[in-house]
Design a protein with these regions (language model features):
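Catalytic cores and adjacent flexible loops of soluble metabolic enzymes
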Residues: 1-362
Length: 362
C-alpha cells in the first residue's frame, strides 16, 4: 500500500487522518505567539504545524515590494514592509524547531522560493509544502523535490493537466508526494470546495496519498473530505479571530481544532466492519422499547384467537415477537388469559388439533 512518511509517521491512502494546523503568518511575526500556537495545536492533537517562509526581496518585483499597502491587516506602509514584518529570523526558526521537538509535534513550512527551501532544508525540517500559487512553478517544484524531503502540493486554481505536470515534475526525482485538493480563496465558500476532486485524484493517482487543504470555516467539510478519501487534512489555526491579519477570521480556534481531531479519530470506529448484528449495548433499550404479544383483554379458555384478541406491547420481557402473530390466530386457548398476559404457543392448541378442525393458518 502506498505510504507517505513525514517525520517518521507513515500516512497511507486508507489509514488514519494526518492533521496539519496551518499557522502560516498568524503569529504576526512574533516568535512567542508562534510558540503559543504550536503549543495549542499540540494540545488539540494535531500531528503537525506549518508556517510559511519567503525571501521577499527575491520573490517580488520591485514595483510590488514598494507598492503602498494600507488596509486594516497591514503590518507596514508598503507590501514589502508588510511581508518583512511577518517573517521570522533564522534564529527564531531554529528556536521554533527546538520548541516543536520539545512539544512533540512536527514542524515544517510552505516555501515560496528556492532560497527559503534551502534554508528550511539546512534547518533539518522534515517536509515541504508547495502553495497553490506555485502549482505550475516547475523550477521550484523540481528544486524542492530534489532536496529529498516529502512534498505536499496544494492544487488550488489548477486544471487536472496542471496537477499532472506537477506530479510528473516531482515524481521524476522524489517519490514522496502528497496532493491536496484545495480552493485558493480565503475563505472558501461551501459550493466552491469541489470535494469530489478527492475521488478524482485517488482514481487518477493510485500511488499517491491524497489530502485536503480546507479554507472553509468550520469542520464539517473536512470530515466529508476524509470520507471521500482525504488522509491529510490541513486547516488554518489561530488563537483569536479578532487578531490583525486576513487569515484569522476563517481559521479554527483551539476548540474547533480539538473537535476536528477528535471526530476524525472517531470515524474509523464509527464505520465499523459492515456486518449487521445486534450489539450488547442495544439489549436493555430494546428489551424496554421492543414489543411482545399479549392478550388484549381477559380471554376465556377455549376462545378462538382473532386479530382483536392479541396486541403487541412493551417490554419484550421474553414474550413472543410480533412476527409470530399469524401463528397464533385461529387457535383455541388451552386456559384463560388475563389482559396483558403473555401469549405463547404453549397457551394454544397444538397445530395438529388445528388441522383436525380444518383450519388453515396464514
Amino acid at each position: 500500500m502506498p505510504e507517505f512518511v513525514v517525520d517518521g509517521k507513515a500516512i497511507t491512502r486508507d489509514g488514519p487522518a494526518y492533521v496539519i494546523a496551518e499557522i502560516g503568518h498568524n503569529h504576526q511575526g512574533d516568535v512567542e505567539k508562534a510558540k503559543a500556537l504550536i503549543h495549542a495545536a499540540q494540545e488539540c492533537g494535531a500531528d503537525a504545524v506549518k508556517l510559511q517562509k519567503r525571501d521577499n526581496r527575491r520573490l517580488y518585483t520591485r514595483a510590488l515590494y514598494d507598492s503602498p499597502y494600507d488596509n486594516e491587516h497591514s503590518f507596514g506602509a508598503t507590501y514589502g514592509e508588510h511581508r518583512e514584518a511577518l517573517e521570522l529570523s533564522a534564529a527564531e526558526w531554529l528556536e521554533l524547531r527546538e520548541f516543536s521537538r520539545e512539544e512533540g509535534i512536527t514542524l515544517f513550512g510552505t516555501v515560496f522560493d528556492e532560497e527559503s527551501a534551502d534554508f528550511l532544508a539546512e534547518l533539518g525540517l522534515p517536509a515541504f509544502k508547495i502553495a497553490s500559487a506555485d502549482l505550475v512553478n516547475t523550477p521550484l517544484l523540481r528544486h524542492v523535490a530534489g532536496l529529498g524531503k516529502p512534498v505536499f502540493i496544494s492544487t488550488g486554481g489548477g486544471t487536472l493537466e496542471d496537477v499532472e505536470l506537477a506530479v510528473e515534475t516531482v515524481l521524476t526525482v522524489n517519490s514522496q508526494l502528497c496532493l491536496l485538493q484545495c480552493t485558493a480563496s480565503y475563505p472558501c465558500e461551501v459550493d466552491e470546495l469541489n470535494l469530489k476532486v478527492i475521488e478524482t485524484y485517488r482514481e487518477r493517482f493510485p500511488d499517491l496519498v491524497i489530502g485536503l487543504s480546507d479554507h472553509q470555516s468550520g469542520i464539517a467539510m473536512a470530515l466529508v473530505g476524509y470520507m471521500l478519501g482525504a488522509r491529510v487534512l490541513e486547516k488554518h489555526f489561530t488563537l483569536n479571530h479578532a487578531w490583525k491579519g486576513s487569515d484569522h477570521a476563517f481559521s479554527l480556534m483551539p476548540e474547533g481544532l480539538r473537535r476536528l481531531v477528535r471526530d476524525l479519530r472517531r470515524v474509523p470506529d464509527a464505520l465499523g466492519d459492515g456486518v449487521k448484528r445486534p450489539l450488547p449495548s442495544e439489549e436493555r433499550p430494546l428489551e424496554k422499547m421492543g414489543k411482545k404479544l399479549v392478550a388484549a383483554r381477559d380471554l376465556p379458555a377455549g376462545h378462538v384467537l382473532g386479530p382483536g384478541d392479541i396486541v403487541a406491547r412493551s417490554p419484550v420481557d421474553g414474550g413472543l415477537p410480533p412476527y409470530e402473530l399469524d401463528g397464533l390466530l385461529g387457535r383455541r386457548l388451552g386456559h384463560p388469559l388475563v389482559s396483558d398476559q403473555d401469549i405463547t404457543f404453549e397457551d394454544v392448541e397444538p397445530v395438529e388439533e388445528l388441522a383436525a378442525r380444518g383450519v388453515e393458518q396464514a
